[in-house]
Amino acid sequence: MLELYEKRRALLLLRLAAMFLSLAALLITVLNREDGFFSINVFGSPQPILAKATADFTLVKGLKFFAGAMGIVAGYSFLQLAIAMASIFSGAPSILGGKRMAWLCFVGDMTASHLCAAAAAVSAQLAYLGKRGAPMWSAVCTYFSHYCLVFGLAVILAFLATLAALLVASISSYHLAYDVFCALYAMYKELVVDEVCSRSMKKTIPRIIKSGHQQRHHHRKPPLAPHCHGATSCKLCILQQQQWADLELHLSRAITLSAPSAVEMKIPPPPSVPSVVEMEMEIPSVSRVLEMETPCK
């Protein structure tokens, strides 16, 4: 369990950082509030009118989106942490689990990282408009300086959470790409070995059949694979020698069993000779013959 934790420690720490940073940005945005006073010039009034307003995240739709995105990222990071800790304590070989779980983690991490990046970009734009203003938007930070200062901290935390989420997504994509590469390499290697084996079998099976006809009941050294050319250090050749021997043995047995044996041959039985008793029953006695030939009195 400790070895698995050491291997996945970076991923766990990044998920933990993304969760805490996004949660902190969410709490700061939701709890941030300030009451401000500003003057309004009314036509016909000699003095401006003071108005009171409360700044919070519900006044701007962009802040609502920012708070919702930070909540989603924090919840997703907590869910992934729970799954990772459960796999560690259960002794699973990998935090990502199988291929399906790896794909789900990859898609979820990419979605969370892009959502966090979009929320951070929206918050940065709102902070710039609040500080600098626009032709149709006044700089509200002159009236709500404390609110803008605290919101700037939330923007920084959002960008840090985005960085952690992007690193998590990159690690997930690396694991997924590594698994896919290993699977493709294994398939390619298996295809190459099968092709070599098929070519060798086409050349070796006739020799085995011929030798099986000549030496049905004698054991001989298995033939070397044709592609080895006498090299005994080839790993593939060494692994295939036992396969050639087993193949020769099975083919020899098949050839031996295919030939009809004396027991299996159907020999017609010899013609039956009548016994002495049967002969006596068939041949009439002399007295009976005489009685049959004597005329009636």
Swiss-Prot record:
Residues 32-64, 123-148 are extracellular. It comes from the Eukaryota. The keyword Mitochondrion does not apply. Keywords: Cell membrane, Membrane, Transmembrane, Transmembrane helix. The lineage of its organism: Eukaryota, Viridiplantae, Streptophyta, Embryophyta, Tracheophyta. It is a multi-pass membrane protein. It holds the Pfam family CASP_dom. InterPro entries: CASP/CASPL, CASP_dom. Homodimer and heterodimers. GO terms for cellular component: plasma membrane. This is CASP-like protein 2U8. Its main location: membrane.
